[in-house]
From Swiss-Prot:
<dbReference type="GO" id="GO:0030170">
    <property type="term" value="F:pyridoxal phosphate binding"/>
</dbReference>
<keyword id="KW-0718">Serine biosynthesis</keyword>
<feature type="binding site">
    <location>
        <position position="173"/>
    </location>
    <ligand>
        <name>pyridoxal 5'-phosphate</name>
    </ligand>
</feature>
<comment type="function">
    <text>Catalyzes the reversible conversion of 3-phosphohydroxypyruvate to phosphoserine and of 3-hydroxy-2-oxo-4-phosphonooxybutanoate to phosphohydroxythreonine.</text>
</comment>
<feature type="binding site">
    <location>
        <position position="196"/>
    </location>
    <ligand>
        <name>pyridoxal 5'-phosphate</name>
    </ligand>
</feature>
<dbReference type="GO" id="GO:0008615">
    <property type="term" value="P:pyridoxine biosynthetic process"/>
</dbReference>
<keyword id="KW-0808">Transferase</keyword>
<keyword id="KW-0664">Pyridoxine biosynthesis</keyword>
<dbReference type="GO" id="GO:0004648">
    <property type="term" value="F:O-phospho-L-serine:2-oxoglutarate aminotransferase activity"/>
</dbReference>
<dbReference type="InterPro" id="IPR020578">
    <property type="entry name" value="Aminotrans_V_PyrdxlP_BS"/>
</dbReference>
<comment type="similarity">
    <text>Belongs to the class-V pyridoxal-phosphate-dependent aminotransferase family. SerC subfamily.</text>
</comment>
<dbReference type="GO" id="GO:0005737">
    <property type="term" value="C:cytoplasm"/>
</dbReference>
<keyword id="KW-0032">Aminotransferase</keyword>
<keyword id="KW-0663">Pyridoxal phosphate</keyword>
<comment type="pathway">
    <text>Amino-acid biosynthesis; L-serine biosynthesis; L-serine from 3-phospho-D-glycerate: step 2/3.</text>
</comment>
<feature type="binding site">
    <location>
        <begin position="238"/>
        <end position="239"/>
    </location>
    <ligand>
        <name>pyridoxal 5'-phosphate</name>
    </ligand>
</feature>
<feature type="modified residue" description="N6-(pyridoxal phosphate)lysine">
    <location>
        <position position="197"/>
    </location>
</feature>
Length: 362
């Protein structure tokens, strides 16, 4: 089988070790005689799997007491509705920072349920920066402040955690940089992430919520969208995504073996540094419009000087075992997604290809 490095933005690359372990256990998990895919979600075998996954995640992130970990379905996009439906309480407004495509979708959905105050936006310069926090126009009476820590499509990442003000809790869509760097969970009211980037396969959403934010859902909320219902049932109100949770648990164990979040963050810095160096040193053959402090460590978005070369670049990259480099249709160009599971060898292979391509076509 030819070696391929998969730079897809999601569903994305999984650690080879995790895939190999899942393969070895596919027909018989730990001598049970059953595949995880066919286990009862309430049987002792799967209860062990989901318990271990939660405990490993708590250890990796240093999740404090007083926070619930929920394994949900519906993707991060469903959270754009679930968050306001659950967290508004007796308030009627939400603060949101607009830094790109996913922020805009969160704003659009939240407007169905609440007044939305866009505290700051970088749309004026095509989302190339994070607006200076001191200039944000916050509402002291907002139910929460929502931001997207990493814009997967645009390649922009918050380099810091915003400060909490007026007791307004922070809510973060961390879908594409979850577990990629150390964060102080205690600074957040809620964090959520779709699994298909740094956690596991699609079909799973991981949510961390401070317990004092539970129980505020509007009265007419559908039962399946109520955080309190899922928290009370330990993510077992209905049948959860058993196999994605199993794979996520394997990823968490793999991540612990890599030195935890601190260890993987160092590796992620190195990988991103290699790619941005080849872009910046290409004499304009490659370029990125994202200002340097806000460049994503997960999604390196760049363009070729001559768009006519785009298809040639993608075709030749694929011939060299470098897959899924086409940028999102909303922005064009290229996107190399280098999540935790992307080995540094894959990034070095891409860097070498980019240098060779620039020499040939520059």
């Amino acid at each position: 089988m030819a070696k391929v490095y998969n730079f897809s933005a999601g569903p994305a690359v999984l650690p080879h070790q995790v895939l190999a372990e899942a393969q070895s256990e596919l027909l018989d998990w730990h001598g049970s005689g059953m595949s995880v895919m066919e286990m009862s979600h309430r049987g002792k075998e799967f209860m062990e799997i989901i318990h271990d996954a939660e405990q490993d995640l708590r250890q990796l992130m240093g999740i404090p007491a007083g926070y619930k970990v929920l394994f949900l379905q519906g993707g991060a996009s469903l959270q754009f509705a679930m968050a306001p439906l659950n967290l508004l309480g007796d308030k009627d407004s939400i603060d949101i920072v607009n830094t790109g495509h996913w922020s805009k979708l969160a704003i659009k959905e939240a407007k169905r349920y609440a007044k939305v105050n866009v505290v700051a936006s970088s749309e004026d310069r095509n989302f190339c920066y994070v607006p200076e926090e001191a200039a944000w126009q916050r509402d002291p009476n907002a139910a929460y402040l929502h931001y997207t820590s990493n814009e997967t499509i645009g390649g922009l990442q918050f380099p810091y955690i915003p400060a909490e003000q007026h007791g307004v809790p922070l809510v973060c869509d961390m879908s594409s940089d979850f577990l990629s760097r150390e964060v102080d969970v205690s600074r957040f009211g809620m964090i959520y992430a779709g699994a298909q980037k740094n956690i596991g396969p699609s079909g799973l959403t991981v949510l961390l919520i401070r317990e004092d934010l539970l129980g505020k859902a509007r009265a007419d909320i559908p039962t399946m969208l109520n955080y309190q219902v899922h928290a009370d049932a330990d993510s077992m109100y209905n049948t959860p995504g058993t196999y994605p949770i199993y794979i996520a648990g394997l990823v968490f164990k793999w991540l612990k073996e890599q030195g935890g979040v601190k260890g993987i963050a160092t590796r992620n810095e190195e990988k991103a540094g290699l790619l941005y160096h080849v872009i910046d040193s290409s004499g304009g053959f490659y370029s990125t419009h994202i200002e340097q402090p806000f460049r994503s460590k997960m999604n390196v978005v760049f363009k070729l000087r001559d768009e006519a070369l785009d298809e040639i670049f993608l075709l030749e990259a694929r011939k060299n075992g470098l897959a899924q480099l086409k940028g999102h249709r909303a922005v064009g160009g290229m996107r190399a997604s280098i999540y935790n599971a992307m080995p540094i060898e894959g990034v070095k292979s891409l860097v070498n290809f980019m240098q060779d391509f620039a020499r040939q076509y520059g």
